[in-house]
Amino acid sequence: MILRKLLSGILGLAGILGVNAFEYAPFNVSASIALKVPGNMAVHYPLILNKLSNGNFDYQLVSDHKLPVLLYQNVTGEGQTKQISLWMVALEDVYFNFGEQVKSDARHDDCLFYMPGFWYRRNLRSPKEAPSFHTSDSWLVREDRLSTPMTTIFDEKNKKSISVTRIAEFEDEALTTHKEGEVILSGKTSIGYTGFENVSGTATLSFGYPYKEAPKTYIRKLTLAPSVEAYQFLKKGETLTLTWEIHETAAEDFSDCVKQAWEYSYDLYKPTPVETSYTDEIMKDVLSNFFVESYVDDTPTKYYSGVELRTATCENLDVAEVGFVGRTLLNAFNALEYGEGKQRADLVKNANSIFDSYLQHGFSEAGFFNEVVHYKRNFVEKNHSIRRQSEGVYAVLYYLNYEKQHGRKHPEWEKRLKTMLDAFLKLQNPDGSFPRKFKDDFSLVDKSGGSTPSATLPLVMGYKYFKDKRYLEAAKRSVGYLEKELISKADYFSSTLDANCEDKEASLYASTAAYYLALATKGQERAHYAGLAKKAAYFALSWYYTWDVPFAKGQMLGDIGLKTRGWGNVSVENNHIDVFIFDFADVLHWLSKEFNEPRFTAFSEVISSSMRQLLPHEGHLCGIAKKGFYPEVVQHTNWDYGKNGKGYYNDIFAPGWVVASLWELLSPGRVENFLK
């Protein structure tokens, strides 16, 4: 441990010495202000930074034209970190949009870019209908799209990064009548913009206030709209102060860049747990109502209806889904364990009925789960996914282990799972990956390896339960693939099934998979897998909010007091927040102890506390029709999945996986106990 700390200190010093201190000066900084008279197109004025030799400010920002505002700027700090503070006073009533550009000393083509929870590398895994280099090599976005209001430029060639981060209280938001073009805000907003631009071949940080988005604004799933530029009103005589922080550091690669950026943003924002009265016991008591009211028993396989529900009614539907957004089998195990502990015979009876019915009617001819069934439409999904199949096996292994501990045996279930795990061995590619989707005859539908880590978990558990080393070796090969193709390349993508892009779940699953193997191995192997888990964990963490997004009056999420810190952005394609966590909190606690990194445990507590806020119950239904049906698509920025926009949910949701995720968060230590 002493040697590790010494090496860490040496590397940190090398990072400091390896970067020339950024110089903020007129030769690499430009600024402009746009002024709008209602009913007229805005006029944009370039600004000149005039150095002041005395007084309270370092620079005055002036134009060739007489402006109805005075602009002054201070630059404080030394070395790698500098704060830029802009002071503005209105000489007349004005509507304005201010912007600034800071050039790096790197070629744009040599750089990768990072906007936490939204932009990784060049977003080339994302479709052209979402923000990516497919559309443009320069992007400006609203700050509330990002888990930290930061943009980082990583110079791959010279192994260094430069970032800009907004520093503010973020207390206000205002509604607008339009979502594109020049828009005048209905009140005060705290939200500015941040991003990167290619300025004559040089990678450039761009930032300003209030928000604007260019070259497009991302308003809905797979929908890019024309750019938007907001205008804030400043009354004559009023002043405004805006602050940003510029930070430079050395970084070995993009993974190191993201790691350092997350540590820096965590230390800068210092997120604290959200105060809530919802204890673990209260949470489970309320959530257990989902097991009661969603239960469907008039179909061959009994299930919890947790997919494609309407938030306005939460009426049960005909869709039974094993994993992914349904998570019927994991919820059945949770209900069984909880029901027996609380002497709730109804929960126990229904959970056992689900497992019994799936054993009899839940499999395809080849022995895979019928992972999605639409009963009224008489439709069974013929394309299997390694993710849903894996999540089903995972849940049943927990069930079998629990039953065995209570003296109950299920040889038919064990036979079924052995058949499935053996099929996994057949599906696995020579490089260790698993195809994302396949058919009953093992022919491939989607050969992408993005969902591979989902298979690692049941393979490790299957090794422990069945004492079959083949499953452990397959798990090791799968993480070997993750190490080579995802972790070492910092390229986490397409783990989820409803989007093809950079996403949170890919890095979260990769970190969790390596963690499972670390628990199942010893010595150098264990240390190696622990290191991989940590490396991937920084990418997963980067999707979770370190700050509280402001909402406007009339936006429900703001009116009920939602604090966004600790919630996770989903993906580039799906720009909303949710409570996807499962046992990643356990991973963070374990890594915190393993590497003496207190940030992991501290932020895990932020996540755990924050994700309790929207618990729907009598008098606090949070826009959901039924108690315990926790919301899924929580829309916190100018984007929606299809309906309702910022401050609300999409009208359709899948509480099945949400309840399962929160339940695992509230049940710490599960896998460590399983693998003992």
What kind of region is each of these model predictions?
Residues 40, 53-68, 72-236:
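Beta-strand/loop-rich accessory regions of lumenal/periplasmic or secreted enzymes
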Residues 231-255:
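Short Pro-Gly-centered flexible turn/kink motifs
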Residues 257-293, 342-361, 405-425, 467-484, ...:
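Extended, well-ordered alpha-helical scaffold segments
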Residues 287-320, 360-381, 424-444, 484-501, ...:
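Glycine- and aromatic-rich loop/turn segments at beta-sheet edges
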Residues 329-345, 391-409, 454-468, 509-525, ...:
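Well-ordered alpha-helical scaffold segments within catalytic/enzyme domains
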Residues 376-380, 398-469, 484, 534, ...:
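Active-site lining segments of carbohydrate-active enzymes
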Residues 385-389, 445-456, 486-489, 495-511:
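Aromatic-lined, polymer-binding surfaces characteristic
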